[in-house]
Every structure is written in structure tokens, then in C-alpha cells.
Amino acid sequence: MDDDKPFQPKNISKMAELFMECEEEELEPWQKKVEETQDEDDDELIFVGEISSSKPAISNILNRGHSSSSSKGIKSEPHSPGIPEIFRTASQRCRDPPSNPVAASPRFHLVSKSSQSSVTVENASKPDFTKNSQVGSDNSSILLFDSTQESLPPSQDIPAIFREGMKNTSYVLKHPSTSKVNSVTPKKPKTSEDVPQINPSTSLPLIGSPPVTSSQVMLSKGTNTSSPYDAGADYLRACPKCNVQFNLLDPLKYHMKHCCPDMITKFLGVIVKSERPCDEDKTDSETGKLIMLVNEFYYGRHEGVTEKEPKTYTTFKCFSCSKVLKNNIRFMNHMKHHLELEKQNNESWENHTTCQHCYRQYPTPFQLQCHIESTHTPHEFSTICKICELSFETEHILLQHMKDTHKPGEMPYVCQVCQFRSSTFSDVEAHFRAAHENTKNLLCPFCLKVSKMATPYMNHYMKHQKKGVHRCPKCRLQFLTSKEKAEHKAQHRTFIKPKELEGLPPGAKVTIRASLGPLQSKLPTAPFGCAPGTSFLQVTPPTSQNTTARNPRKSNASRSKTSKLHATTSTASKVNTSKPRGRIAKSKAKPSYKQKRQRNRKNKMSLALKNIRCRRGIHKCIECHSKIKDFASHFSIYIHCSFCKYNTNCNKAFVNHMMSSHSNHPGKRFCIFKKHSGTLRGITLVCLKCDFLADSSGLDRMAKHLSQRKTHTCQVIIENVSKSTSTSEPTTGCSLK
């Protein structure tokens, strides 16, 4: 056999069928080929591989006498660095010519077992020198370099065997030697390297000592390097407060919402950054895909002018209450307080259906409450659009909304003072309060218009409370004129192209995900190992590198000279539709337990009301005293009051409850019982200790009378009042104290 090619594999394509052979005239006894052995189990096939040198100089290793010299090695002649051609990938064979093998290469045995999932390193002199580690994935393998090999110069590479496609395998590396362990730990493999190099200055102690490290090279299919997250291994994460461990990220999120909600944002942000695969931001060489999150693709932030504005320390006077405020930020807060007071004084239906955060109006107070609980929360969910400040039921619906409505790098919220831009309204508001404090500038929270005078600012502020404002359909801003709205529409474009899209080749696909989700490599058909049920968006970048992206659904794309991003949506759940989705839990992809319970109750109640059989005649609601024409439409929804424990299915009764119980001005309360007030005239309250009497209109006076006189008691007399007579014999009575 030639010296240039001392290794001849029988089959490289299959992992378990790699068998190494070599022919040497003079071999040491321990260098002779070990015969294949087979255990009692028929499924445990053992394949033995050998790598030997062309010179018997490796036998000098046996001359070591002291165990303390574990980091020493024999001196060998310098050899040209390189990797045997058999171990090179296809790309390496094209770039570099074949090189000579490394002298005194390690000898190891590869054992493939289908019934175990451990990696073992054995030494003949130390039978207990073993280390077990869990195999991360079915499609990955672990290669441990033998710890009894000699030290090599730093420029030399250790040949490694790349194996793919093996399931439930483990490798046992054996080295029958009588000497102590002289270990060499290779450097951690980089992304751009295929074979790790040796660091001769480091050594591997025995397994019995605490600081044990093993030189492992994780080799997975399709990538040069991989991590335990790529391999699909369960990585335990602990709650920072109670130290309860979880295998998946979503159960940890659900636990932290109830255990430590104040720590969830910061703690999960660190976990996502640390667990994100290193190759997720890079284009795959084979498929040409790029994986990006919604936050990276659509959202952005631009600092604008960095020069500091001079402070004027101007005072502002409110012409409504003649109060003088020290600076502009306090005056803005004062105006917001005036707005809240005016809403409380004005008893209108809009006050109970308008969101106090984004100033949107909803048909019912229940829908408003659902919007606040799902969108304006301190926790970030993967189903919320930060530009619109709206929440969606699933991540797939969110991605469809982002594709149809927004552009990559869209920043519609602009500070008119310094041109600071952001995709979220809260960033601009926080920037204005921090950077432009103690100046003449006053920011409108409705349209972000900046004024420098108090009186025009207050007039502009109050005009937003009137009807007929022009709302932007793509964000939360609202304007007083259609001209301002048209000028604002120009901001809904790509302001800064994401850095990840720069330099992409034509035809490269970009996968947009709403969240990372639990990565599972057991689904090779899903892009980049995304979990079933995880929604993603595939975007093909334009051939020309332009900074503006156009939506393909817009018919007026000819107005812009830039090209478009053609987007197609798909879901990874189509890959594995037969498997249940019970284990995969998403933060907001599924409705909350409370909403799901209310939905089920509503569906059951609606079905029962539709199928109800009642007697003919007039039916009245005992809560609102109105006629019931259709039971299903009258009791359409189950409403729970957010201020007290009041629950009802009657929408009219809930409106009256909000007006009468949670209003600051009882004299202006709106009552829906005016049509039926005649039936309430039969109620009389009599004090049993004195001559104090009160009818149905004097209930508050009777309550005040009883509260001032602790020993007095009251009796309620209810009379049946007909339409013709106003009084009759008392029918029922009860006493109150």
C-alpha cells in the first residue's frame, strides 16, 4: 500500500459501516488489528477502526514512568499540517491537495450500539476510566479523541471522521496501554472549520478529579458545528425564584408568570440570547436560507440627531385651572390628568369602551377588557404586533398581518425634534421624556405633533376628544385632518433595511419566525428544526440591493423605484399533522385559560338558549326588565366586571351597573329602568324605632339614617302595584338594620 494513502475505507456513506485498515511490516503487539467481537445481543455490532503510523516511534510512549508528568509528550519531527484525504469533506478536497497523514496518530475503536446512548472512553490499565454523556440527537454523533496519544505541534490537525445519519448510536474508544494518561484536549471547533486543532498546552485530568473535561466534537447533519439545542437535547432551565427546573422554555414562561412576573422579561431575554443557535443568523451554504425573528425583520430603531438640545427651563400655565407647571414634562402629565377628569365628568358610553393606552374604541366594555389584558401587559408575547399594538390569536395570523400591513425595518413613530425613529410608540415617548425634558417642546400623545406654546397645545389636545378624527389603519396614531394623515402614511415604509438582508445572493430565502420556540431536530423536514406548530414566513429578497421593500399585494408598486420582497407564508405544523400538539405550548398562540373557559361557556349557553322550549307569551328579563325576543341574542355574552365581582349575561344590565356603581357622580347616573319605574313605586321603607319613612327614591336617605343611628332598624314593605291603582295591601316584608 502507498504511503500517501494508508487508509482505505470500505464505505463512508453509512456511519456504522466505517472500517479502517492499515498494513505495516513491523507493528507493536498492541498495534495489531483487533478482531471483531460480537456480544450476546444480535443488534450490537462492533466495528473496529485503526489509525497507525508508518514508523514504530509511538512505542516510546510506554517509557513514561511518573504519573505526574501527564502533560509531557515525546518530541516528534515536525510534519506538514494537514488532514488525510479520507477525512476531508468535499469542499476541502476541492480547495487543498491531499497531504501526508500525521505521524503517530492515535489509535481508537469505534463501537456502534443501538441499545445505548452513552459515550465511553476506556483505558486498558484503568478499566474504571469511563465517562458517560448523553447523546443529544438521533442524527448526531460524538467523537472522543483517545487520551493516550502523544502531544503534537499546534500546527497539526487531528483527523476526524464525519458521520451522519446514525440513530441511537454510541461510540466506545479503547486504547490498551499500560501507561498513564497523557491527554490532549483539542480546541473548540469554530463555525468555519471542519476539523478541530490540538492545543498542546492543555491536559485532561482523570475522571475522578472534579475539573473533568472531554474533547468532544458534535457533528450533526448539514452543519459544521452544533450545540445541544441543535441536537434536540432537553436542557434544564431553572426558575430564578423557586429554582424549579423545566425542559422547555414555554412551560418556564407560564410558571414565571405566576411565580415571579417581575423577573420574566429580563430573565427570559438572557435565556433567548444564550440559547439561540449560532448559525441562525448566517446563510446556510446548501439551502441558502436565513432565519430571522419578527423583531429583527420588521422592527427597528434609529437614534436620529445626537446633538443635545439646550435646556430652557420654561414654565407653562394651564388656562383651565390657572396652575403653573415647572417644565414641559409636568405640563404634559397635567394635561393627561385633565383628560381623565373630563372623561369621568362626562357620562358617555365612549368612556367605558375607549382604551386608555392606545385610545382605540371597542363595541363593548368586555372587548375592551380583553384587548387590555392581551395587549397592554408588562410581558411580551409572540402574538402582539408592536407597531399596531394589537394582539392576535395565533402566531400564524400575526405573520400574515405583518406581511400584509408592514414593511421590513418600518419605523412610523418619529420624534419631530431630533428625528428619532422607532417601530414602537413607547420608545418615542420615553425618548422624548428623557432627551427633551426642560425644553419648550410639548408632545401630543395622539399624533406625536410637537408644539412650543401652552395655549395652542391645549387646544390641539382637546380637539382630539371630538369625533371625526382620522385614524391610521397601520398604527395607533390619530390625526385631526386628512392632510396630516396622508403625510404620515409616507412613514409606513422601510426606513432602514435589516443588516441581515445586506449582501444576500439573489433567490435566497428568508424564514421569518414569530418566536424561537423549542427546537427539535427530530423533524428534518421542518426548516432549521422548528417545532411543529411554529409559524414562519419565507421571504425571497430582491435581486437588486435596495433599501425599500414593497408589499406584493399593493397594485401601485410602480410609484416606487425599489423592488419588492415576495413573501409566502407557511406553517411548520403541516409537516407533522398526525402528531398531537399537546406538548408544544406557546406563550400566546393559544388563548388563555380564562378566555378558553369563557368561550366554552358561551358556546354551551348559546346552544342551550337556541334549543330552549318556552311557553308562548311575553318574556321579560329580570335584570333589565325588557322584553326578550330571542334568548340567544339577548344573553349573547358572559361579562365579568373588572372592578367588582358582578357577573351577568345581559348587556343592558352590565351597562347600568357600570354607570350606577362605578361612576364618580351619582347625580348624573344613567338609569335604564326609567320605563319600568312605575313598578318600583310599591316599595316603602319604615323605621321601626321612629317615624322615618322613605319610598323607592329615598333608599339612600334611609341608609344614611340607619348608619347614623346604630340601634334603629328598618322594614321593607313591598306592595303589588297595578297599572290602575298605586297602592295595595302589603305582600312581603323584611327588616334591615
UniProtKB/Swiss-Prot annotation:
One of its GO terms (biological process) is regulation of DNA-templated transcription. PROSITE patterns: ZINC_FINGER_C2H2_1 (PS00028). One of its GO terms (cellular component) is nucleus. Residues 57-66, 112-123, 176-185, 211-223, 535-579 have a biased composition (Polar residues). InterPro entries: DUF4195 (IPR025243), Snail/Krueppel_Znf (IPR050527), Znf_C2H2_sf (IPR036236), Znf_C2H2_type (IPR013087). It is found in: Nucleus. There is a cross-link at residues 5, 10, 14, 33, 55, 75, 113, 126, 167, 174, 180, 187, 273, 522, 564, 574 (Glycyl lysine isopeptide (Lys-Gly) (interchain with G-Cter in SUMO2)). The modification Phosphoserine is found at S80, S227. The modification Phosphothreonine is found at T223, T540. The keyword Zinc-finger applies. SUPFAM superfamilies: beta-beta-alpha zinc fingers (SSF57667). GO terms for molecular function: DNA-binding transcription factor activity, RNA polymerase II-specific; RNA polymerase II cis-regulatory region sequence-specific DNA binding; zinc ion binding. A zinc finger (C2H2-type) spans 316-338, 353-376, 383-406, 413-436, 470-492. It comes from the Eukaryota. May function as a transcription factor. This is Zinc finger protein 280C.
